[in-house]
Amino acid sequence: MRMKKALAILTAVCTVTASMCFATVAQAADKTDLVIALDADIDTLHATNYSTGVEQDVLNQIYDTLMYYNPDGKHDPEPRIAESYEISEDGLDYTFHLRDDVKFHDGATVTADDVVFSLELFKQSEYQGSQISMLSSVEATDDSTVVCHLDTPYAPFLQGVLTPYICEKAYYEKDEDAFATNPVGTGPYKFVSRATGSNITLEANEDYYRGAPEIKNLTFEVIPDVATKAIALQTGEVNFAEVDSSVLPQLQANPQIKIAEVETSGFAYVSM
């Protein structure tokens, strides 16, 4: 499982097991453009069939989820597109009440049918579906209420619904190819363009239900090489990057660059 990566100017830091180093370049307070280095190119922007962390880094800005981790240090799941939720006494039914002010980037309002569609599509995903495998069925009881049914109680279920992006059912059904290459979400940034092997460009969603982002233009530059990425930070070509420990001394020597060590969550395993 990979949680939303910390972009201090965009979102909050998630914590737990492994340390990672990030470098940021000092910027003018009124700067409205941000360039972030990616370690590798993406293969898709499909909301459920992605398989890499860099894809999720981009998708996190385009889409939102029902719930998210509270960044106050406790990291408890809290509502996002969902306004509130209840859990039945037997732990088998989770009822989510949706906000009424969430719109997709094309102007369509998010409905319970979109949420049902998104959870069902996510569960079918070869790459992501295991995160909500405990979900037996899901239904919309009205336009703003979704009920998830489990066969057996599963206490971490709320953590499971932190990951599925909420997608527009009508957009997917209209053009599944565009769904994977020209995504339409509800997040703080809208997809603009992609140059394969080079960059992905996003622009601020001025109608974002949580408030328009201060950063208006967000670009992800594909820079796999560690040394090249370090040079790009020093020249100001990029403003934010995950950096390797081998280049830390040269970056720390630059007063315009700030290094932050943060905690991130993940699973590591050995295949036998």
Residue map of PLM features:
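Sec-dependent signal peptide cleavage junction
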Residues: 20-30
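Short, well-ordered beta-strand elements
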Residues: 31-40, 83, 93-96, 115-118, ...
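N-terminal lobe/hinge region of extracytoplasmic solute-binding protein
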Residues: 37-89, 120, 184
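Gly/Pro-rich hinge or "lid" segments in bacterial periplasmic/extracellular proteins
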Residues: 70-72, 162-213, 217
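Aromatic- and charge-enriched surface segment that lines or borders ligand/interaction sites
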Residues: 83-126, 141, 147
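Surface-exposed binding/hinge segments that line
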Residues: 90, 130-171
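Ligand-binding "clamshell"
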Residues: 132, 250-261
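Ligand-site clamp/hinge motif
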Residues: 205-251, 265
